[in-house]
Amino acid sequence: MGNLLSKFRPGCRRRPLPGPGRGAPAPLSRDASPPGRAHSVPTPRPFRGLFRRNARRRPSAASIFVAPKRPCPLPRAAAAPLGVLPAVGWGLAIRKTPMLPARNPPRFGHPSSVRIPPPSRMFTLLLPSPREPAVKARKPIPATLLEETEVWAQEGPRRVKKDEDPVQIEGEDDEKRTPLSSGEASSTSRSQGTQGDVASFRCSPGPLEGNVYHKFSENSMSEKAQASPASSCLEGPAMPSTHSQAGCARHLGKPDPDATAPPEPAVGCSLLQQKLAAEVLNEEPPPSSLGLPIPLMSGKRMPDEKPFCIPPRSAAPPRAARNRPCKRKMSIPLLLPLPPSLPLLWDRGELPPPAKLPCLSVEGDLHTLEKSPEYKRNSRILEDKTETMTNSSITQPAPSFSQPVQTTDSLPLTTYTSQVSAPLPIPDLADLATGPLILPIPPLSTTPKMDEKIAFTIPNSPLALPADLVPILGDQSNEKGGSYNSVVGAAPLTSDPPTPPSSTPSFKPPVTRESPISMCVDSPPPLSFLTLLPVPSTGTSVITSKPMNSTSVISTVTTNASAHLTSQTAVDPEVVNMDTTAPSQVVIFTSSLSSRVSSLPNSQIHCSAEQRHPGKTSVYTSPLPFIFHNTTPSFNQLFGKEATPQPKFEAPDGQPQKASLPSACVFLSLPIIPPPDTSTLVNSASTASSSKPPIETNAMHTTPPSKAVILQSASVSKKYLPFYLGLPGSGNTQPSGNTASVQGSTSLPAQSVRAPATASNHPLNPGATPQPKFGAPDGPQQKTSLPSAHDFLSLPIMVPPDTSTLVSSASAASLSKPAIDTSDMNTTPPSKTVILQSTFVSRKEEYIRFYMGLPGSGNTLHSDSIASAQVSTSFPAQADRRPTTTSSHPLNTGSISHSTLGATDGQQKSDSSFILGNPATPAPVIGLTSPSVQPLSGSIIPPGFAELTSPYTALGTPVNAEPVEGHNASAFPNGTAKTSGFRIATGMPGTGDSTLLVGNTIPGPQVIMGPGTPMDGGSIGFSMSAPGPSSTSGELNIGQGQSGTPSTTSVFPFGQAAWDPTGHSMAAAPQGASNIPVFGYTSAAAYIPGLDPPTQNSCSGMGGDGTRSIVGGPCVPAFQQCILQHTWTERKFYTSSTHYYGQETYVRRHVCFQLP
């Protein structure tokens, strides 16, 4: 086709481009080959050098006419339209030979050959009649609808070939061999097998599809446009009925004396028009509102809004329209068929999903519908889908309904009218997420006839559904694979009756991204309400489920029950009250189980029923538990943050232990996690009295996820608060978090004490802390109460999974897990951690408790930026009968509670409490401790630093503290802190007295933390106190000179000690005096003006003005080594004081250090 089409750029249509040689190009035409030549006329190539230069400055296309080489049967006109083909020489003589340049005169052989201009970017193609490419079938259009269309093509001729190649003729090879003469050109073309196609092209060409950009190539020529010399007569808008010389001359204009008439008769064209017109009527109409054909495949338009098409052979110039008065130039509107609508997916921002219409599946007496055609059609589907209900070996039969029984306690219902239809099959599990919500309702008492509209009632509100209603997911599939999603009965609600005060569950449908739900009834068996639920059994089931999405009600639920009491059962829809909640929410409700169980429709549920025994707890964990309890079928309150947990645990002293939890208790993410293995609760001991209390979830409360509260204890008394119990071999590790925390570790001897060793392990809480009280295990029971302002919202209650090393080589006859009495428990903000801290027995004063411990624990220091403390206790071979309570707590910014440490006999004595330190207003104390002998540096004191005291209950002579009149302790003011580390090596022998905790000297470092006291002249004062008889007072003076050499001081008169010059160890002898080496480690001490501590009055002073006093951390003689880590803000001088409490004496000495 490249040699048949031309590129035009008429000057009247397009503005000539600037520059020399870019005038209006002359139209392109071709001449016929001479009779003796077997090649086709060369086609202009899209190269500039192949054309003559003067061809670009030719006159406009209106004055160009085609001059064939030999006489043409058609008359030639002077103003013939450009691109008119000659009448002869266009048969099958087509060869795929390379094109020759137009400036080669011997090729053309005719003096009147037209010079071909170079191709341009924009050209106009006049289509005499568009047609469709011969891909599958040609779709011609009647000649009455033909119109010439003038379009502008904007692209190059690259993609033209693929639209013209499909119409290549089969007689092409004959043309290469046999040249045609002028007399046999037209007859030869009609004698070929494509004569019908040629006639159809001349008379009524169809719409042309494809790209309009044609590539001028020697390989693309079409016989359909060549076969007839009279095809040039089809340029006009009105097709002549006969193709004669007059008709052609009318369109060609000036006649040619050498032209001859075409030999084709006029009848053949008219018959072809009638035949093709009938074929068009049988085809689909084009998508056009104007009734006009769309000649374009893609409907692409050019900037001038003119659709474009392709001429099969050539096109006439625009100026030739003046010679054709019947021609109309019309831009066919662009009408493209819209692509098939795609389903818009939800959650992608397009449109919400359609409303899922819950259908009430009325299942009752199915005998009335056995003869129904719908029943027979759906019965086959029911048999195929009932086998896909479970994913295990448990068979879950379809729910059966009782005979029609009219009950008097039915709920007020709303009347609906529905068309009688067949009972619906149970949908497959794959349809759970896509189908509407189906709610089975009990059958009515009336039996309707076939194809009769029945009126029955359904609950007006989803919260007032009967107790036996279970939500069913899935849609109803018909025999063709479709779904019955249409609303059969959609009568509006007529009334809103109140809910009767009966024990009915609350049904909450999913509300997230759901459209308004309309109830519809899709099956008409006889309706009747079910009978009452069976009597609750003694078995308790805990059903756990994973989080579900908003479209599904129930996910696959599995319960892992105990191995000895596990029975795989299913949940009967009559006894299970399932509720639909949000994916991240959990519903804990109660339900009774019976011997007759069946499956929940459209949900795979495995329930493990376990028989409850006193003293044993069965709670199964899962991300989303559904807890069923053996009570009357009713929903408990949904969980809420406003509900407060009230668990109550009683001692296992014969009475059944019960954990009472509020009915609104649901854990959002982490449920109660008991130890999975408690068979090794006591090592090498009898577990006759060890038992786990059952947990009753009717009082359980919820806690936010990722928070936890650790409560563990091994007390004997009923009312003991279960703190963290640390015994030897437990492998406790220090917490590693930004929040300060403590950890206790207790090492028991071979013969352990009868009393439990309780250690409290809690991170610090900036708020108020609880005040637990510890009493004797064999005396009056002391109740553990927590302040009402505390709640364990941060972390759920958890128990260590392994307690095999809870007691080592000891009898566990008196050991048991105490119950938790949370009657006084309260809530706190979720982001806070509860610190359970013991209190002092102080009748009139409050003290800030510090650090207490014994050597030999090998504890490690917490590595957080926030201060923390660590406790360790080592018992001798001959331990005391009294319980040893080690409390380790970091100091917080809020008020710190105090603990009461009572005697072993349970009686609070005047000397049963040991108080150290001056009375002071509670203030935050933060610091870091280290078990090594090397001091730490970098500790920073927060604002409001105060004194530290340490309780000690195991010493023989505790002091009941009564502060001296008029004495007050001072605190450091707010300001920038500085650090300085000191190491004090002390030693104390053991006398073997049962009143002393340490019977023998136990090696190992011990850590104590306390603030240094800045004094005048660059000294640091540190306070140390020790209990003793009323006539005994201890004093320890530690100093350091400018040279840095250690100084010696006298130790308490408990014994005489000989110190090692290295300061790392020392030996002590009782009832003597010894010197203790003191090594001072200071760091970057600087004076900060304007930060003076408050002036205080003191009883006595040493080496100072006696006007200011501040207390540091204590150092009890029982410690083998004391590593002092303190912080100060100024260098001031402070005094010491002595307190007298009745017949007992409490001595406090301030040790001064001289700073460089």
From Swiss-Prot:
<dbReference type="GO" id="GO:0008139">
    <property type="term" value="F:nuclear localization sequence binding"/>
</dbReference>
<dbReference type="GO" id="GO:0006405">
    <property type="term" value="P:RNA export from nucleus"/>
</dbReference>
<feature type="compositionally biased region" description="Polar residues">
    <location>
        <begin position="1028"/>
        <end position="1046"/>
    </location>
</feature>
<dbReference type="GO" id="GO:0043231">
    <property type="term" value="C:intracellular membrane-bounded organelle"/>
</dbReference>
<keyword id="KW-0217">Developmental protein</keyword>
<feature type="region of interest" description="Disordered">
    <location>
        <begin position="680"/>
        <end position="703"/>
    </location>
</feature>
<feature type="region of interest" description="Disordered">
    <location>
        <begin position="1"/>
        <end position="60"/>
    </location>
</feature>
<feature type="compositionally biased region" description="Polar residues">
    <location>
        <begin position="179"/>
        <end position="197"/>
    </location>
</feature>
<feature type="region of interest" description="Disordered">
    <location>
        <begin position="872"/>
        <end position="915"/>
    </location>
</feature>
<dbReference type="GO" id="GO:0005654">
    <property type="term" value="C:nucleoplasm"/>
</dbReference>
<feature type="region of interest" description="Disordered">
    <location>
        <begin position="481"/>
        <end position="515"/>
    </location>
</feature>
<comment type="subunit">
    <text>Associates with the nuclear pore complex (NPC).</text>
</comment>
<dbReference type="GO" id="GO:0017056">
    <property type="term" value="F:structural constituent of nuclear pore"/>
</dbReference>
<dbReference type="GO" id="GO:0005886">
    <property type="term" value="C:plasma membrane"/>
</dbReference>
<feature type="compositionally biased region" description="Basic and acidic residues">
    <location>
        <begin position="156"/>
        <end position="165"/>
    </location>
</feature>
<keyword id="KW-0472">Membrane</keyword>
<dbReference type="Pfam" id="PF15229">
    <property type="entry name" value="POM121"/>
</dbReference>
<feature type="compositionally biased region" description="Polar residues">
    <location>
        <begin position="732"/>
        <end position="750"/>
    </location>
</feature>
<feature type="region of interest" description="Disordered">
    <location>
        <begin position="1026"/>
        <end position="1046"/>
    </location>
</feature>
<dbReference type="GO" id="GO:0007283">
    <property type="term" value="P:spermatogenesis"/>
</dbReference>
<feature type="compositionally biased region" description="Polar residues">
    <location>
        <begin position="219"/>
        <end position="231"/>
    </location>
</feature>
<comment type="function">
    <text>May be involved in spermatogenesis.</text>
</comment>
<dbReference type="GO" id="GO:0006606">
    <property type="term" value="P:protein import into nucleus"/>
</dbReference>
<feature type="compositionally biased region" description="Basic residues">
    <location>
        <begin position="50"/>
        <end position="59"/>
    </location>
</feature>
<keyword id="KW-0539">Nucleus</keyword>
<dbReference type="GO" id="GO:0030154">
    <property type="term" value="P:cell differentiation"/>
</dbReference>
<feature type="compositionally biased region" description="Polar residues">
    <location>
        <begin position="680"/>
        <end position="692"/>
    </location>
</feature>
<feature type="compositionally biased region" description="Polar residues">
    <location>
        <begin position="884"/>
        <end position="915"/>
    </location>
</feature>
<dbReference type="GO" id="GO:0005637">
    <property type="term" value="C:nuclear inner membrane"/>
</dbReference>
<dbReference type="InterPro" id="IPR026054">
    <property type="entry name" value="Nucleoporin"/>
</dbReference>
<keyword id="KW-0744">Spermatogenesis</keyword>
<feature type="region of interest" description="Disordered">
    <location>
        <begin position="219"/>
        <end position="266"/>
    </location>
</feature>
<dbReference type="GO" id="GO:0005643">
    <property type="term" value="C:nuclear pore"/>
</dbReference>
<feature type="region of interest" description="Disordered">
    <location>
        <begin position="732"/>
        <end position="786"/>
    </location>
</feature>
<protein>
    <recommendedName>
        <fullName>Nuclear pore-associated protein 1</fullName>
    </recommendedName>
</protein>
<feature type="region of interest" description="Disordered">
    <location>
        <begin position="155"/>
        <end position="204"/>
    </location>
</feature>
<keyword id="KW-0221">Differentiation</keyword>
